[in-house]
């Protein structure tokens, strides 16, 4: 019934047949064979139902070649399965296009397209595209490479009262340039040179119309109070330029640059010089001009309405309710604000102090201002917070060093070895109480609480932190445990010395103190005996 099954190998056919027999009652059959873009069934069938295991053979379409087994098989799931078995054939490389380029859009495989284009100034003769198509048993390009030929322009036009650089024998191709010149006493109006360009990618045209040659004469303008910075003759021709300024105290109204036009007139209109504005920067006390104003420092005239901003110098501040600006008024005078005033520093609290150079005839908004200084002394029992009792008012409105003031006598931080203070700082004020806490293994010898007295000393006397000998360490005869009793493992040297001494003591004890009496005095014996017991 299915002669196409003969194309399947015998072992594969046996496996497919067995699976079909076993699974056919359980699973569904396959529908019509699949429609593949690259191949068609060898035998066309209009059946719509195929048993599991059916294998159909396909042939590759034109433009494709077989790379694998070309069978599709109905599997146990009722689906047609296959591996891609046809691949697109490849067209040859199209080569290089002189004065143009070949653009490969995707690849060189069957069905792909390449595009041709010419370089600027060249016209394309032939097809702009070519496709990789089937030609018999192989594939090749549908269209050959086109030709790119250079674009040509007609001869440039002649002009009256002038000529161009070309000759009758010249061939004008893309990029060719010709230049026009006028006869003596004539001015060239327009572009002196024109070039051969391409229109619509195929037609050669000149870049613009040729210029003309005309007689143009402009006379030097009369500008009262004006100064000519360039151009000092009496007559000028087309495109000649004048640069104009005004004398000090006058301002230019109009353009400072004018050109002689083709109609023998100046353009823009001839300017004028008028006395309009404030002269020079005004004098304002204690200010510094902003950077953009400093750039105008050499400017002689400022127009009416000119607004100049300033900052206050170091140590000065803007006068309250006054703008930090000066304005040029219609009467050609500067409207000047009150400027800046010195920065104030706060008046010191006179409690427990007196100022040696106290000011009594001050004027202004504050008692002490920038650059003022104070010498002061403190009452008995107090001292200045600045070492020399001197303080100066700074630009930021702060006293340096610190605002003049007096503090009560202080005590320095007590030095407690192997201990710490309840309050840690460098200085302590009068009547301030401090508690001493010894490190672990140490005990306070002396009062634990001390107070800063008015004479800058601590009372009672500053205590010490000494090693507290544990009960089990008081008997040193068994010196082996002595290291465990030490407060600090770094004291190994001391421990070894003590251990050595304990061994000697033990030996002396065994010898019934015979040799001890020879080596030690009665007082030393008493100390050793006490240490052993």
UniProtKB/Swiss-Prot annotation:
Protein's organism: Cavia porcellus (Guinea pig)
Single GO biological process annotation from the record: acrosome reaction
Free-text description of this protein's post-translational modifications in UniProt: The N-terminus may be blocked.
Tissue occurrence: Testis. Not expressed in heart, brain, liver or kidney.
Subunit and partners: Homooligomer; disulfide-linked. May contain 6-8 monomers per oligomer.
Function in brief: Probably involved in the formation of the dense core and M1 domain of the acrosome. May also regulate the release of certain secretory proteins following the acrosomal reaction.
Keyword tRNA-binding recorded: no
Principal location: cytoplasm
Keywords (A to Z) from UniProt: Cytoplasmic vesicle, Disulfide bond, Fertilization, Glycoprotein, Repeat, Signal, Sushi
Keyword Glycoprotein applies: yes
Protein name (record): Zona pellucida sperm-binding protein 3 receptor
InterPro entries assigned: C4bp_oligo (IPR040514), Compl-Cell_Adhes-Reg (IPR050350), Sushi/SCR/CCP_sf (IPR035976), Sushi_SCR_CCP_dom (IPR000436)
First and last residue of the signal peptide: 1-28
Disulfide-bond pairs as recorded: 30-74, 60-86, 91-132, 118-148, 153-196, 182-213, 218-260, 246-273, 278-328, 312-340, 345-393, 378-406, 411-452, 438-465
Sushi domain sequence ranges: 29-88, 89-150, 151-215, 216-275, 276-342, 343-408, 409-467
Compartments it resides in: Cytoplasmic vesicle, Secretory vesicle, Acrosome lumen
Superkingdom, natural source: Eukaryota
GO molecular function, one term: structural molecule activity
Glycan attachment sites: 68, 77, 185, 191, 200, 433, 455
PROSITE patterns per the UniProt record, alphabetical: SUSHI
Record's GO cellular component terms: acrosomal lumen; acrosomal matrix
């Amino acid at each position: 019934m299915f002669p196409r099954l003969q194309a399947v190998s015998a072992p594969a056919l046996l496996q497919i047949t067995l699976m079909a027999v076993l699974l056919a009652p359980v699973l569904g059959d396959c529908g019509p064979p699949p429609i593949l873009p690259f191949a068609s069934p060898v035998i066309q069938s209009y059946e719509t139902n195929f048993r599991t295991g059916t294998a159909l053979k396909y042939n590759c379409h034109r433009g494709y070649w077989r790379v694998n087994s070309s069978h599709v098989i109905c599997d146990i799931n009722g689906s047609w399965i296959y591996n891609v078995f046809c691949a697109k054939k490849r067209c040859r490389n199209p080569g290089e296009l002189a004065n143009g380029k070949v653009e490969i859009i995707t690849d060189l495989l069957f069905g792909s397209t390449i595009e041709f284009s010419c370089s600027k100034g060249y016209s394309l003769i032939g097809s702009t595209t070519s496709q990789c198509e089937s030609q018999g048993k192989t594939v090749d390009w549908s269209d050959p490479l086109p030709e790119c030929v250079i674009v040509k322009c007609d001869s440039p036009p002649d002009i009256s009262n002038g000529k161009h650089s070309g000759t009758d024998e010249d061939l004008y191709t893309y990029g060719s340039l010709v230049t026009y010149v006028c006869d003596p006493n004539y001015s060239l109006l327009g572009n002196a040179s024109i070039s051969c360009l391409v229109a619509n990618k195929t037609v050669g045209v000149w870049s613009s119309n040729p210029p003309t040659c005309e007689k143009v004469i402009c006379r030097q303008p009369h500008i009262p109070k004006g100064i000519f910075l360039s151009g000092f003759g009496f007559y000028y021709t087309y495109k000649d330029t004048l640069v104009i300024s005004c004398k000090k105290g006058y301002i230019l109204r109009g353009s400072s640059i004018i050109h002689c036009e083709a109609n023998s007139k100046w353009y823009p209109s001839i300017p004028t010089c008028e006395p309009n504005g404030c002269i020079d920067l005004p004098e304002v006390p204690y200010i510094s001009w902003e950077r953009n104003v400093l750039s105008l420092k050499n400017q002689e005239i400022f127009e009416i309405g000119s607004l100049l901003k300033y900052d206050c110098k170091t140590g000065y501040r803007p006068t309250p309710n006054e703008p930090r600006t000066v304005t040029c008024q219609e009467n050609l005078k500067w409207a000047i604000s009150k400027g800046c005033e010195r920065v104030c520093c706060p008046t010191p609290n006179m409690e427990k102090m007196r100022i040696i150079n106290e000011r009594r005839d001050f004027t202004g908004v504050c008692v002490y201002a920038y650059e003022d200084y104070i010498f002061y002394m403190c009452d008995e029992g107090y001292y200045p917070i600045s070492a020399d009792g001197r303080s100066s008012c700074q630009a930021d409105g702060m006293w340096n060093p610190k605002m003049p003031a007096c503090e009560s006598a202080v005590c320095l931080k007590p030095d407690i070895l192997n201990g710490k203070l309840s309050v840690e700082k460098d200085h302590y004020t009068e009547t301030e109480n401090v508690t001493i806490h010894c490190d672990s293994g140490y005990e306070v010898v002396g009062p634990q609480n001390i107070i800063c007295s008015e004479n800058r000393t601590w009372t009672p006397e500053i205590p010490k932190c000494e090693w507290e000998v544990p009960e089990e360490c008081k008997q040193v005869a068994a010196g082996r445990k002595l290291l465990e009793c030490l407060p600090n493992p770094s004291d190994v040297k001391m421990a070894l010395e003590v251990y050595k001494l304990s061994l000697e003591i033990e030996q002396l004890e065994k010898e019934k103190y015979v040799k001890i009496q020879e080596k030690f005095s009665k007082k030393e014996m008493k100390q050793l005996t006490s240490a052993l017991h």
